[in-house]
């Protein structure tokens, strides 16, 4: 994989200064990927891509502009730089815009093991074999497994190089592998789709393809025979995927842009209790091999591990330099950007610290309630914290999973929901960059028939 070297990035920065820029930064991303999909054993997708792009952010005083290009010859780049400088000169000034304080740039970068040393891009034949194996395992698991939305395997590798006119330069490389399968179970006229996936930076650490297929089949089968329920208030047990979505919503309200726009229910809540005392939510960019790990953020600032919520208390907001300046706070190393866009705010590896309960113990504590396994639509108002989602899952009776339910809506308010977290599971599993164990909320409205 041909990558961009630091010499070219520095030449672009020098050219920007020669053309009149007061400050500049360069982001170069080189990526290669292969995706292979099958449906009912037949090839449905086979796509390979290679790309090198350079993004340039130019400042002319407090005015700025961003451009990107895939033409990396110096003659083309010289014209590209000149055009971006002119765009910055013509843009409106913004008093909050600018590069970070140079003193904040790291002197050294951590080694985070983001690239698989043993595997690169998986071959097309191997990728198709893996996808077929997963789908076949799902369809063979039970006679009621009648159809499939398909299975897909993806592999990729990339290099990120960042440099700015303050003298900071850094780079890192990574790999990623994922497999997803979506089989369909049928019993009479009733059909239900299952879904399961595995992802990792190391090919050898992926869940076995047959196991992924079987899990997806089980999840489809357990949805057959779904019933409707009456409207009531009852406990809800969030499975790990649903719990991860919940904490993503909560932490999204702690994002700088939402805060300075006044569009978050967490405005003014820093240092205050927003959840039960057992709730600690961590954003950790430094987990070796983590799917969201990176040694520096999208503005060249050091990343870190930090408790966003610490024993129920909102301990920090997540900020890039722009939102930090507007809020009068320090940036947190959570800037993220693509080659053609301005920095935004993003989490890295976000997780809810696990508790001591097994999922069986949590379910066993519920006399009557919902084990939540799916939600539909967005339905979260970040300004008020109001939460209302179409949902499905398995009804709990006397501490046991009794029967599937669907066509229901669950509703509450995020602050009330987080304050009502009663039990947290010990089943944290790193399958994505945002994860959580099983958790139980004391009571929510469940609207049924």
Map each language-model feature to its residues:
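N-terminal small-residue-enriched
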Residues: 1-449
């Amino acid at each position: 994989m041909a990558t961009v070297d630091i010499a070219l990035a520095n030449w672009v920065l020098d050219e920007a200064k020669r053309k009149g820029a007061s400050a500049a930064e360069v982001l170069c991303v080189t990526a290669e990927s292969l995706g292979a999909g099958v449906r009912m054993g037949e090839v449905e997708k086979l796509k390979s891509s290679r790309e090198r792009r350079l993004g340039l952010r130019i400042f002319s005083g407090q005015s700025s502009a961003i451009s990107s290009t895939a033409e990396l010859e110096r003659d083309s780049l010289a014209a590209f730089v000149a055009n971006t400088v002119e765009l910055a000169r013509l843009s409106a000034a913004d008093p909050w815009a600018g590069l970070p304080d140079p003193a904040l740039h790291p002197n050294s970068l951590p080694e985070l093991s983001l690239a698989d040393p043993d595997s690169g891009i998986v071959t097309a034949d191997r990728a198709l074999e893996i996808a077929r194996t997963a789908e076949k395992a799902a369809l063979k698991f039970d006679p009621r497994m009648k159809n499939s939305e398909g299975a897909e395997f993806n592999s990729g590798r990339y290099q990120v190089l960042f440099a700015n006119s303050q003298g900071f330069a850094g780079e890192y490389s990574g790999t990623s592998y994922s497999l997803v399968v979506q089989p369909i179970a049928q019993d009479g006229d009733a059909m239900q789709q299952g879904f399961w996936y595995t992802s990792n930076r190391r090919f050898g650490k992926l869940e076995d393809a047959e196991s992924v297929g079987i899990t997806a089949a089980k999840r489809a089968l357990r949805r057959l025979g779904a019933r409707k329920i009456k409207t009531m208030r009852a406990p809800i047990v969030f499975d790990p995927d649903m719990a991860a979505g919940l904490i993503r919503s909560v932490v999204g309200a702690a994002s700088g842009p939402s805060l300075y726009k006044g569009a978050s229910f967490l405005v003014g809540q820093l240092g205050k209790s927003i959840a039960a005392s057992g709730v600690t939510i961590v954003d950790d960019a430094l987990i070796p091999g983590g799917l969201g790990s990176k040694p520096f953020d999208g503005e060249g600032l050091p990343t870190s591990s930090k408790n966003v919520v610490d024993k129920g208390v909102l301990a920090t907001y997540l900020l890039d330099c722009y939102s930090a300046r507007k809020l009068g706070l320090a940036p947190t190393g959570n800037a993220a950007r693509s080659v053609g866009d301005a920095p935004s705010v993003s989490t890295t590896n976000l997780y809810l610290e696990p508790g001591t309960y097994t999922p069986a113990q949590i379910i066993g504590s519920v006399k009557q309630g919902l084990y939540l396994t799916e939600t539909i639509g967005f339905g979260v108002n970040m300004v008020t914290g109001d939460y209302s989602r179409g949902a499905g899952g398995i009804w709990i009776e006397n501490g046991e999973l009794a029967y599937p339910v669907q066509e229901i809506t669950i509703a509450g308010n995020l602050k009330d929901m987080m304050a009502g977290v009663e039990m947290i599971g010990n089943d944290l599993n790193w399958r994505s960059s945002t994860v959580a164990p099983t958790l139980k909320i004391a009571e929510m409205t469940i609207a049924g028939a």
